[in-house]
């Protein structure tokens, strides 16, 4: 299959088809017809039979231009993206339906990847133990309750959209009895720009090329004629339709996506209107995002997707709607869920993992040796153990006071605050100077460490007794490590694996720049906001705005009672040069909201929740080649998570669910058990 541009014409060869658009006029005919239909009719036509679509297209275009439109409509006969099944390895015709009795599987990490793996393993009869350091499952979808204005309200890490091409994730939800009534379809995909009018992309057709043309047709800033006048800038856009895993990563993983766009002289309006705001949703800035990963991202979400540009949103919080039912299903299948337990290291015997060392209650353990000279004379000194455990130490009354600085909610490092206590910037947990919980989601106080002197060094221990942590070994036949990047690095770093190349591949993994979520309760509605969710472009911090009081309970009810609204401002990836103290970032985001919605100038903030965190996967140029895959040098250790290298075109939450299933399939192959089908969007782009 190939595609080429020649003068003012466009040609494509695919399978046995040959279609040509001989002139700019033909393309403008399509655009005129597309623009005339409107967003509502896109939704209707998107699910039509192809011939019916063509018929209505020609009728709409009019008899006078029918001949030209007929030529271009032949594009619909070209290869259409269709759902496929990914092959994750050889399958046996006589495979068993269940695992051999008594096979023990330990899954580390209770996010979507870990839940996905645990569910599939348990369905086939494995004895599964799921270990999660946080007090609740869910990972980036987890949530908790806070008290806001006298009411208990659920909060989470930020807005999540659920796309139709999340095939494996949606199947996982369905297996837990989660039905469509927890979702509502988003009415459109609006983009707010700082320096130009807003763009709104309605539901797009699922039929190529009308899905692409509809985006151009709905845009105020784009038109086909401009693209063809700037034909050099069109070539790299066309090449994005030629996504092919091996070729794309060989050619483009060495440069960032902004460089790719600039070198290709892509039409600036297309970069600003489409590529930049959509690429930011990878949680990586274009300037540090691998061009190959960006091309895969666009292939998965739009250019190679048979599902169109549509997504769903939950009408209640994600814990209630999604995670709690998944946990119920896990327990129904017999999974032992160890939430609030931290996996420390892997025990190796030969080329196999024999077990997982886990922190439980009731013991003691040495954490850190430190010289007294390294502890500052006043205030808290922040230290990190060899295993990556953050510690806070200070001099007090001729002795020393020390805390394990991991928040008891999800293990994020806490920092001293102005009140003399401690603050978790990830989820707004607050602790007193004694480590007691003052507010937010942490379920327990910080762990106070014992400090002993010996041989001129300070030795920091977990305390003796119930407040401490004891190590226990979970023996296993198989282990799936489905932690995030930071957790995986810590566990592998703590384990004596004697596998330098694998250990380096994990150590080299990184997180994207920090993201910030700022949820605010306002005393007045934002009447001009007609959508529940907006992508934002051109501002220093804000990348999206979600109006929770427009789509999710209990915020809808709260707004109805008070006349106010609840808004969430989300910064996807804050550049190092833009990092500021919390109050400055909050003030800047409020000012950006005022610029987007002028009526908010006079509103009062009644309550707020601000969190900043860095746990999304980094997709930097050059990362891909060294990224570890699902299989490891150990025959019974498998990896899962959105950060794991896979050939399939998957991303974000779908990548987590997909790799969880891949890890389960690797176990099934080893035991001669039937594997789980893995649906995906097409492996290759339409011009590959």
Model regions: which residues?
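Mobile amphipathic helical/loop "lid" adjacent to a hydrophobic cofactor/ligand pocket
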Residues: 174-175, 180-295
């Amino acid at each position: 299959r190939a595609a080429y541009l020649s003068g003012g014409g466009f040609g494509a060869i695919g399978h046995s088809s040959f279609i040509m658009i001989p002139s700019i006029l033909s393309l403008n005919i399509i655009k005129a017809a597309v623009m005339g239909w409107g967003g509502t009719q896109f939704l209707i036509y998107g699910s039509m039979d192809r011939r019916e679509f063509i018929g209505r297209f020609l009728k709409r275009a009019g008899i006078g231009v029918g001949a030209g439109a007929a030529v271009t409509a032949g594009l619909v006969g070209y290869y259409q993206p269709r759902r496929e099944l990914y092959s994750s390895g050889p399958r046996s015709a006589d495979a068993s339906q269940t695992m051999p009795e008594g096979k023990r599987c330990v899954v580390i990490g209770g996010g979507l990847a870990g839940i996905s793996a645990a569910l599939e393993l348990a369905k086939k009869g494995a004895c599964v133990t799921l270990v999660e350091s946080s007090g609740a499952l869910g990972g980036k979808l987890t949530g908790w309750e806070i008290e806001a204005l006298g009411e208990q309200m659920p909060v989470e890490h930020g807005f999540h959209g659920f796309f139709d091409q999340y095939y494996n994730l949606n199947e996982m939800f369905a297996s837990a009895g989660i039905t469509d009534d927890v979702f509502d379809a988003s009415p459109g995909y609006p983009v707010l720009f700082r320096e130009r009018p807003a763009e709104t992309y309605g539901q797009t057709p699922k039929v190529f090329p009308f899905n692409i043309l509809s985006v151009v047709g709905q845009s105020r800033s784009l038109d086909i004629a401009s693209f063809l006048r700037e034909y050099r800038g069109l070539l790299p856009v066309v090449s994005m339709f030629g996504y092919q895993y091996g070729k794309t990563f060989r050619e483009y993983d060495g440069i960032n996506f902004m460089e790719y766009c600039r070198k290709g002289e892509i039409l600036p309006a297309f970069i600003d209107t489409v590529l930049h705001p959509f690429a930011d949703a990878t949680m990586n800035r274009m300037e540090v995002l691998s061009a190959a990963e960006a091309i895969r991202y666009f292939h998965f979400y739009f250019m190679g997707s048979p599902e169109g540009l549509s997504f769903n949103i939950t009408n209640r919080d994600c814990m209630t709607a999604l995670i709690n039912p998944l946990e119920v299903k896990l327990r129904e299948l017999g999974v032992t869920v160890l939430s609030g337990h931290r996996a420390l290291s892997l025990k190796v015997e030969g080329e196999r993992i024999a077990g997982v060392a886990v922190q439980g209650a009731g013991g003691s353990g040495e954490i850190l040796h430190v010289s007294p000279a390294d502890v500052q004379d006043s205030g808290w000194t922040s230290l990190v153990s060899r295993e990556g455990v953050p510690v806070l130490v200070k001099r007090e009354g001729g002795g020393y006071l020390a805390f394990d600085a991991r928040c008891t909610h999800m293990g994020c490092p806490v920092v001293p605050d102005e009140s003399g206590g401690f603050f978790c910037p990830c989820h707004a947990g607050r602790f007193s100077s004694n480590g007691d919980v003052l507010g937010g989601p942490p379920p327990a106080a910080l762990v106070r460490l014992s400090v002993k002197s010996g041989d001129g060094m300070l030795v920091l221990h977990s305390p003796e007794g119930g407040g401490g942590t004891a190590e226990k070994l979970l023996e296993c036949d198989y282990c799936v490590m489905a932690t995030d990047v930071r957790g995986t690095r810590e566990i592998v770093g703590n384990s004596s694996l004697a596998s330098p190349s694998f250990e380096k591949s994990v150590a080299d993994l990184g997180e994207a720049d920090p993201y910030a979520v700022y949820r605010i309760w306002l005393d007045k509605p934002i009447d001009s906001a007609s959508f529940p969710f907006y992508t934002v472009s051109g501002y220093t911090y804000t990348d999206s705005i979600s109006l929770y009081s427009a789509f999710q309970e209990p915020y809808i009810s709260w707004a109805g009672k008070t006349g106010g609204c609840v808004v969430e401002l989300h910064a996807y990836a804050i550049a190092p040069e833009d990092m500021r103290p919390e109050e400055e970032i909050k003030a800047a985001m409020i000012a950006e909201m005022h610029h987007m919605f002028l009526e908010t100038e006079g509103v009062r903030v009644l309550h707020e929740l601000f969190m900043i965190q860095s746990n999304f996967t980094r997709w930097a140029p050059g990362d891909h080649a060294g990224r570890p895959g699902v299989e490891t040098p150990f025959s019974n250790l498998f990896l899962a998570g959105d950060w794991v290298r896979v050939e399939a075109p998957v991303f974000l939450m779908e990548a987590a669910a997909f790799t969880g299933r891949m890890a389960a399939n690797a176990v099934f192959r080893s035991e001669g058990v039937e594997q789980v089908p893995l649906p995906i969007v097409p492996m290759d782009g339409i011009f590959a």
